[in-house]
Structures are given as structure tokens and as C-alpha cells.
């Protein structure tokens, strides 16, 4: 088995790590950073950008720059009304599925495809770092992700060319790195507030066993929502003062979003900061500028409802674990949004102790995923991870009621069965609707899928015995089987249909990704070639100027002609010519070095004219 990596596929940033020498190590990306922005963009010329380079050009290309896509993965139209308002790109629906419009390519992407581009970037950079091709991974998801979102994450990995060995919960991964050396039993509360999701898990950790006691969360709450509070405040204030609604301007909205995120980050260390956005818009009277001072107090006031919402899953997780706050030994903070002072104060108030600050909240999840990857690869011994299912699972029964078969916070993998019967006499079949959620009625829970069991023997209602078995694997992905005991007839469903992508679409996307791999690599190579050539032209002009009096006129003319020829090929994007001309220019620059060295040597020899200066030296006393 080759190297198995651990990946934290985040809303804002993503991280990849691996076990090296028995220790988990974060792998830097090609740009040298330990985190990679979860941003994908397409330029007008069709070039794909991933990571920080994509984020940097978002203001000038808002409709083709896709960020926070994790908030849409595995979701249906009726689940994203809040998130749609926060993007500068166009999110639309195709049936019940979500699509992201890319005007630059005149194409629609599934969220899984965009996430796959981020995964591909992480894996390619890791393969270069490790010197071997990475094909297997453990990927983390928020603990409160439902079955659809988990399956969609797995699909994204598949589209990226990965064999996803395990999907594990983010707040479960975090203690794997934190508690690796713990010998004594401790009860840990993991508070995981990321860019787009929020989870709280309570675990028992000690002697290599990591047992999740409970988990709770909110997949509609994260750092993006804190940014949005600032954005809406700025829009409202600008409209009152200038009479202009910036919400209708995509470019202005993107600038506001970036400025809000920057202000939020700065207010974690400062008590106030300035937001200055010159030329935010223009009218007939001329350009308009936005200048605003934001204090930490104002930020906390704007976000007070979000901060209050964070306390609910904490209380729920403690209640489900049947623990008091005083029973918690350690609080581990995960996710960049936990740097907000008001969040840290709220956690301290609820639990009664200072959070543990020894872990890097941006990296701890990926490090934990790498530990789990090491377990699966056989590199790490004596570690046992006992995770739970975050939401109850059941079926619809008579009257539109959800009957729970597996309660939330059940340790996985698990398998449970219940026996049901028919509702009317001589009923030939039953339709089984699989549900996930905590509400009592079917309509208030999420439907994961429906299947039908035919061939039931004619009998009075209540006589046939239909055994429904729920089986959850270690990834938290569900399969359901129904069996009529009298006839032995059975029908089953693996809830992969819960993914927003049909199997055919996933396979098509995998094929497209493979087919486009060479094209993408060629584009990347062309961009690198172009950048190197432009740099070479600059260096050549600089050297001609610097050594003008030390090189021959013929060499100077030759280099100037090569620069002109190279710039012409750059303009026409003739990449083969660019490479050959660059090589010739490089050779000529070496000639400059030789001539300059010869000229320098000649000057040194000329200065030594053999004259002897007659003088006396006195002896040093």
C-alpha cells in the first residue's frame, strides 16, 4: 500500500497531511503554504486556477470564482436559501440538484466537481512533495453532515481520482492528533467552528481509544455567516448615506465580502479596524468610496445572535452524553473562527475552563485524518476510533410519522432491525421511505431515498412480517434492506442515491477529469513557460544595461533581436517557439557573463603597470 493521506476539505481552506517517521506532518502546497484556499476560478481564456491564486483575482472575476462550495455539496434546492445570498457567483437548480454556473466556460458544475478540483490540487502537490503518486485518502466532513453530504464528499474524491478509504468526522479527527500520547482517560469537548459549518463532539480519550459519546451541530453556521453580518451592515449604511444598493453589484459584493473577512480576522487581535474601499461604485456625480471604522464591540453586537446560536449544540452535546459541564477535562478549539474572542469567552462561560490553545485550529483536523490514514495503512498501531452517527435514522410509517430505527449518537459501524407489517388487507407491496432527522413527522425530516418491496403474500393487515434492517458502515454511509419473512423476498437500497449526483454523472465526471488532466497539465506548463520567458526578457534587458561597456555590439544586437522575437512569440502564444527562443537567449546571457568576466580580468591586469613606489615602513612597536 502506498502513502495514504489525510485531507481536511474545508469551506474556506483545505489542508493535507501524512504520516512521516511515525508522526503526522502537514504537507505544504506548491506555493509553500500549509493551507490551500478552497477556491476555484476559470479565467476568460478558460484557464483553471485553484487556491490562493484563484482567491486573489476574485474581485475582477466574481462570477467565475467559486468559494465556500462545501456549503452546497450534497444539498437540495430547499436547503440553501440562506447560503445562496452570500455568493457573488450564480447558484441555480437542475431538478432538485444544485448547479454552479460558470459563464467563462458556458457550463454548469456540480458542487462535487468544484470540490474535486481542490482535492486534485492538494493531491498533486502532495505527490510532488512525497515523490510518489497519491491515490488513497481519508477525508474529513463536519460531524453534522447528513448521508447525502457524506456521499457527495466521497463522490468529489472519486472525481479527483482518489480512492476514499474512510470518511471521518472533523471533531473526531481533531483529538486523534491532540490525544495521541494521552495515557490517562480524559473527557474532551471539541468545539469546531469552521468557515461554513459548526460541530460539537464529546469524546472519551485515553490509552489509544477515542470514543465519541455525542455530537451536535449546525451545518448552516460558520465564519461566512459572521462575515455576512458585516457585509449587510455595510450595505445598509451605504444605502442610507448614498442611496445606492451595493447588493446588486456583484463586483462590489465580492469586495465587501473580502473586506468583511479581513476585518473579522483583524478584530481577533485589535479592538478596532478600518474598512477602506475606494471606488466601490460610481454615479453621474463621480466615483463613490466606502470608509468605515469597525470596533470589536460593534462586530460582537452584529454577530450576537450567531454567538448565542453556538451555545445550543454545546448544551445538546453535553445533554446527549449525559454529562455536566464540570465533567469536561479539556476543551479543544478547531477551525479558524474559534479565534474570535467572543467565541472563546462564550466557550469558557459554558464549560467553566479556558480552552486548550496548544493545537493549531487550522491544521489539527488534517493531522488527525493523517493519523486515521496511518491506522488504515498499518503505520499506526493501538488506535481505536469509535465514532457515532450524528442524526437519527428511520422509516415513514402510517400517518406520515417517522419511526426511528437507529437513534442519533449510536456508535458506528452498526446494524439494527425492526419488524413492520401492512396497513391494509391483502397489500401486495410496501413502499419504504428512509428518513434522517430528529422530528416526529416525515415532512420535517430529510428523505434519503425510497424503495419498494413487492410480492407480499395476500393476508389480513398486520399479519405479514417485514423486517427492515439498517446498516451503517464506518464512513457513516447507510444501506437498508427489507425482507418479507414468510416468502423470504427481499429488497435493498444503498443510500448513494442520497447524493445529488446520479452514479452515471459521477462516472462521467471522473472520465472528464482524467481526459482533462493532460490538458490541465499542458495549460499549467504553458503558463510556467510564459512566466519564465517574461522574466528572462526582463533579466536580459537588465544585463545589457548593466554590462553595456563590457560586451560587444554584435552580442548586444543579437540579444536585443532575441528579446524582440521572444516577445512576439509570447504575444502570439507560440509555446514551442517560446521554449526554443528562451534557450537561445539563455545561452546568449551566458556569453554576457563570459565577456564581462574577460573584461574585468583585462582591467585588473592593466592596473598592474609594474611601477615600484619607493617608501619607508616603520616598525610597529
UniProtKB/Swiss-Prot annotation:
Nucleotide-binding as UniProt keyword: yes
Pfam families: HSP70
Ranges for region Disordered: 598-621
Keyword entries, A-Z: ATP-binding, Chaperone, Chloroplast, Nucleotide-binding, Plastid
GO cellular component: chloroplast
Gene Ontology MF annotations: ATP binding; ATP-dependent protein folding chaperone; unfolded protein binding
Compartments where located: Plastid, Chloroplast
PROSITE patterns cross-referenced by the UniProt entry: HSP70_1, HSP70_2, HSP70_3
HAMAP family cross-referenced by the UniProt entry: DnaK
Job of this protein: Acts as a chaperone.
Official protein name in the record: Chaperone protein dnaK
Organism: Pyropia haitanensis (Red seaweed)
Lineage: Eukaryota, Rhodophyta, Bangiophyceae, Bangiales, Bangiaceae
Name of encoding gene: dnaK
